[in-house]
């Protein structure tokens, strides 16, 4: 959620740190700060509430010299968003400075202990407790910074990614992580540190992903020293970044979200490349092929995810049960991990996360593994925690998704999970070969069909203006399109701040119908499908109560068009693939409403792209 950047080397650190913070803005934040050790050995901290630009303005007339520094964007957890609570934080003597992502659960116990030892606190944060604890350990045990960090973190309960500067050792950054991501970039006699690779890619493509409960010491012109908390030396594994700098630019679009919506034809092709082969009539997913027997003997699939990824899991549930004929449950990771679920070694747990770093999903994986389940990860970020923790998995390969509201990652997740369900079904012979071959052909047609939908962008922009007045919106769908209703409502909530709810259309009569009025727009997802006539009946019920209807229908449908105030069409496809098409108009609708309202589309208030705290 927060963002960490660090640099040590030959260049001036400040410009690199500020550029890195801008790269991390998509993660969500409410304040920013930087710490630098200047050539005279002074440790300077500058911070500001608001955007990184506010920090730049504040630091403009300050001493920002130095070739070593750390910087941070904060998303408030402990203490309100203000300059006092912003990171970095000094230690009591101002010898140390720290930045931190995560939550220290036992911070109050540690705080009271430190107060008894004469320490004072200037902020309300758990982070300040951590830097005071490290300084106290360093002083009382008479150890160096790396050892002090190791010893201090052994006392900590919770998740963290930290970076620490020591005024008395101006040639070293010490960092550590547990449950929150941290990556080191390797340059020529210099090192870069960040929460993810986006601030690093401009300078190097060689990285080390720091493991859980590992501490790394970075010094100029020396190899990184990586140890466990118990000081066991680890051998770093250097990876090559697949990310490119051009992927982090808007490419002529006004917002990253619009760029990412329009990228979906390409990203779906990328997700299918080498996996869906029409000539060979095959779906080849290596994560499935390498573990085929495990999938074929499983008695249950459990999908665990959060937010948009949970909606993708709900769609996949239909496909796993319809085609692979495997019972499937979909769980919120945050609930699953705490409710003592019954898990066995016969289960496959599919964990979905765009970032691969979602804290609750990682905790759910840990619980499932402890009970013997096989873990299959579906994520986008190569080398992420979920990718490294899972027994097997499948990358979505959509490239970096910068907009906080997920778009291209969602459709790729649905695609990959549908491909997996069909691959299992073919091996189990629970799908007719003719239908399987037909669906392979339809998968390949999806990108072209999305391009047709995107041609309606201007029309959606025009009628979106009419609905900016709305304070509440209901989204309705059935079957495979019910989770699309949930996703459409979430998109509108996230970026336009309009309250919206998704319901199964048949449930409208069990409560939501009481809300229908001229002031309550209703978005109905009504493509041709087995429940089409029932959806039409629902629309008639809305019309009878003077509700304003926006419908998503199959091309050529005149019946629903005549009942609707506004209609968006999608090309025909099989029911199991419809969500990949029907969600596109809802993404565009939410986007245009938010833009007309003047909302910050890419960085909506209070939201973070990667939820790395519980």
Can you say where each PLM-predicted feature lies in the sequence?
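Conserved short alpha-helical segments that host acidic/polar catalytic motifs at enzyme active sites
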Residues: 1-250, 254, 266-300, 338, ...
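Structural beta-sheet core signal
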Residues: 4, 98, 164, 175, ...
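Generic C-terminus detector
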Residues: 257, 548, 561-563, 573-614
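Glycine-rich phosphate-binding loops that contact phosphosugars or nucleotide phosphates
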Residues: 296-438, 442-445, 525-570, 589, ...
